[in-house]
Amino acid sequence: RSTPSNSSAASDVYKRQDFNMANYDFPVDGVGPWDMGVGSYLSEGRATMDSGKDPRERLLSLFGRANYSYRDRYMVSASFRREGSSKFGANNRWGNFWALSGGWRISNETFLRDVRWVNDLKVRLGYGVTGNNGFGNGYTTRMYKANDMWPTNGIWQPGYGSVRNVNPDLKWEEKSELNFGLDFSLFDDRLWGKFDIYHRKVDDMLYEVNAPMPPMVHDTVMKNIGSLENKGWEFELGGDIVRSKNFRYTSSLRLSHNKSKIKRLGDDGYFLDQVTFPSPGNPGTAVRLQNDVEIGQFFVYKYAGLDEDGKWMIYDKNNEIVPAVDGTKSNLVAENKHFVGNAIPKVILSWDHTFRYKNWDLSVFLRSWLDYDVFSQVNMYYGLANDSQLNVLKSAYTRNRNIKDEKILCDYWIDDASFLKIDAINLGYTLDLKRWTRYIQSAKIYLTIRDVAVFTDYNGINPEVDINGLNPGFEYVNNTASMYPQTTRFTLGVQLTF
C-alpha cells in the first residue's frame, strides 16, 4: 500500500441565520418590540401565535478549518469560529471559539509493519472551546406583553408589562474540553474498539436564578453564574466473534463513567436551593448547588430511625440523633441537612448481540446503570398509611408500616436504583422472492419487543429517571413516566425490498 507523503485541506465558511416574525392590526401604538400575539392578522384563520412570542433572533458565524496529514501517520487539524448572537447584550455579542487536534496512526509505522494481527492503531489528542447561547430571546433587551395586570399607584391595572427581567451583561457560556483517545482494530478487523478520557469545563454558565422583588419585576433573572467541571471516560469493544458459512455472531459493549462538580457558583457562601416539592405537603427543597459540590448529591435530612411512637429521628449538623420534631421545637432546619447519595451512575453500560443463521436474524439489546441513587417522590407522597387521602401504595402497610408520622424530606426515600434492562429483542426471517416475482426481491417478517424486562432492587416504580442537568435523580409525582410502570410493546411487521 502506498500513500501520499503530504496532504492538506482548508476551508472557510460564512453563515448567517435570521428568525423574524411579523404581525399587524395592533390595538395600541407606541410600544417598541411588538407583542406578536396582540395583532389580529395572524389570528384570523391565517396562523396562530401565542402572546409573548420572541420577535427576532440573529446568529452570524465566520468559520475556518485546516487539516494536514503526513503519510497517513501524523495528522493535525485546526479550526476557528467567530460567532455573534443577538441574544446577548451589545458589548458581549461576539465570541471566539477554536479547536486543535492531532493524531498518530501507529499502525503505519515501520516497526509495526510486520505485525499482522494489528490492522489499525491510532492515538488522538484534542483541545477545543465552544460557545452556548441556548436560551430564549429577550433576556438582554426589554420585551413587553399585553393583557397582564400591573401595579399602578397601588392599583392593579391591565396593560403592557415586561415579559421577564433583563440582564444586559449576559455573555456566551463557554465549554472547553481536553480529550485523549485510542482507536484499534485487530485480527483482520474481527476485534475493534476505542477508549476516550476527557476533562471538560464550563465557564460563565447560563442559569436562571432567583431575583429580589422589588426592585425587579419578576422573581427570576438569567445570569452567568459560575463554572462546572466534568470528568469521565468512555470505552467501546466490539467483536465479530463467530463467523461461518451459515452462522454469525457479533457483539459490542460500551461503558462510560462521568462525574460533574460545581467549581464556582458566585461568591463563597452563595448557594441555590433547587427541586421544590408539590403542594400540599411541600417539605422544602432537596438539592443545594454551591461551590465544590458534586452534581447529583441530595441535600436532605439523614434518617436515624423511629422513636417508640413511630416518629422520625434524624442526625443533626453534629451527627447526633435528635427527634425531627421535639414538642414545639422543630429540628427540620437547613443547618441540619446533609449532602447524601449521588444520582449519577458510576458506570453506564450497553451491550448488544446480533445472531444470524441462514435467513434468520436475532438481536438483543441490554442496558444497565450501576451504583446510583434515586429520590422517590412517589414513595414519599403515597407511601404512608396516615396520608389516607393520598396513599395508594402497598408499601404503606408493609415496608413503611411502622411510620406513624407525616412525611419529611430525608434519605429514607432514597434508594439504590441500579438496574439491568433487556431493552429490545428483534427477531426476523427473510424470504427470497426473486424466483417468484420480479417486482419484489425479498420480504422480511419481523417481531420487535421493547421494554422487555428490568432487573432491579429499586423500591420505586421506574429506576430510569432523568440523570441530566443540575438536578438529576428524582422520581417525580407529577411525571407520567414516574407514576406508571413501563409497558412491554410488541410490533409485528413486514419489510419489502423492491
Predicted regions and their residues:
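Short, exposed "boundary/linker" segments that immediately precede the start
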Residues: R1-S2
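Extracellular/periplasmic, surface-exposed regions of secreted and cell-surface proteins
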Residues: S8-A286, I414-F498
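Predominantly transmembrane beta-strands of Gram-negative outer membrane beta-barrel pores used
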Residues: D12, A99-S101, D352-T354, S363-F365
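Surface-exposed, extracytoplasmic segments of Gram-negative outer-membrane nutrient-acquisition systems
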Residues: N153-V163, K201-I225, K259-I344, D352, ...
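Conserved SET/PR-domain catalytic core that frames the SAM/AdoMet-binding pocket
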Residues: S252, E335, P345-N359, D423-G428
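A common structural microfeature
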Residues: N359-D361, T488
